[in-house]
Amino acid sequence: MQFVFIYLSDNGKILAMTKKIKYLLMLLLGANLSMTAQFGFSHEVGAFVGGVAFQSDFGVRHDFKTNAGNTGIGVGLVHYMNFAYRAECNCYTPETYFNDHFKVRSELSYNSTKLEHFGEFADKQTLAGAQLRAMKGEAKVTDVGMQLEYFPLSIREFTATDGAWAPFLGLGAHYSFFDNNTYSTLPGGLGNPNNVYPRYLPDGFSSEGGSTWSVVSSVGTRYKLTELSDLFFELRWQYYFSDWVDGLNKNPDLWKENKANDWNLWFHFGYIYYLD
């Protein structure tokens, strides 16, 4: 019976998360359609894949082993509103600075990172060191959001020139649904307090998951592949408004080293196709 209850409970969490994602996607679609009707623009769609370095309560801040070890993979789908070109008339829009230098990006993305404790404290041959080495985790995050991208060079000129480069800066907000799995490989797992690093007692770990807002900031460039397609490369920083994304959260009032919420750094590349 316990197994059935756990299964149904997890199933309920997945269904609730799916409903929220569908609702947010409908809001984004509605916003895009509204802006299309009011302003007129063309559409671009694409996909990307890349690596993620997850910075969390696992490991030690500014430690190479932590930075190199707690890495995962991210994938995503993107949609762009291109204000420089109107699809309905197959013509350029009025030449304004905004139309020629900004795009709005909508995104659905997913990243997953397996997490471990690295660094000087986990390397110690003590009970505390063994507790840290045995503690593992995984952060799985689904994002829905938008960002505004600024292109310093002319979007019109880039669109008309094969082989051109178009650097950009981006800033936006995502709503993030996270699922974490924190556990210990020691007999009895984290249910046995003797297996838990003291600074995570009594309630500094969780596998419940949840959702939170996050802010994203990026720098990247596009490369004009053909008249209707681009490649793009992007380095992105994402900061969550929660410290539970990784499943660990030491009490910041007691442990001053817990200075920031969870965040990650993405590097990915992708392909973009112009629909109109």
Predicted regions and their residues:
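Short loop/turn motifs that connect adjacent beta-strands in outer-membrane beta-barrel proteins
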Residues: 38-41, 82-101, 154-166, 225-229, ...
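Residue-level detector of the transmembrane beta-barrel scaffold of outer-membrane proteins
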Residues: 44-46, 103-105, 168-170, 230-232, ...
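Bacterial Sec-dependent N-terminal signal peptides
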Residues: 1-42, 47-48, 275
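Extracellular/periplasm-exposed beta-strand and loop segments of Gram-negative cell-envelope proteins
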Residues: 60-66, 113-143, 178-212, 244-266
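Transmembrane beta-strands of outer-membrane beta-barrel pores
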Residues: 49-55, 108-114, 152-154, 173-179, ...
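Predominantly the C-terminal beta-signal and adjacent terminal strand-loop region
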Residues: 40, 56-60, 65, 212, ...
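Short glycine/proline- and aromatic-enriched beta-strand/turn motifs that initiate or cap beta-hairpins
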Residues: 37-88, 272-276
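Residues on the lipid-exposed face of transmembrane beta-strands in outer-membrane beta-barrel proteins
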Residues: 47-51, 75-81, 87, 146-150, ...
